Amino acid sequence: TVMPTSAPKDCPLCFPERENVLWHDASCRVIRIDDPDYPGYCRLIWNEHVAEMSDLSPAEQRHCFNILMAVEVALRECFSPDKINLASFGNVVPHLHWHLIPRYLDDRHFPQPVWGAAQRKGGSSPAPRVDDARLALAVRNAIAEHIAG
């Protein structure tokens, strides 16, 4: 990913050390987060170093939202969660990105946010095991269908 020269040298999303990229285009990428409690946890990262959705043009906003919705569809298809959490904070890393997290009624933190206090002991996640290749294919297919119409 080529970042503009205005990107801060310490931005971990502009200059990632290692990412498990499931899909990408010139504007953004979808990565899978390695979290044993939340194996379907993905992140949608805008490639350009901007902080807010409103920093994007209307066309870029639509593209970002279309990708976000397509990834949600893929996560629902692959993981059959009770809920999908979508979050965009940027308080710690002020680079536009979205968290997409399949949630289950009996996951470690439910009904609290995954960053909140655990509600039960960790252990095996209630999520089905889905390998990277299957999830990447589901993401690509959902994006193609969502963008097509």
In which residue ranges do the predicted regions lie?
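HIT superfamily nucleotide-processing domains
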Residues: 2-149
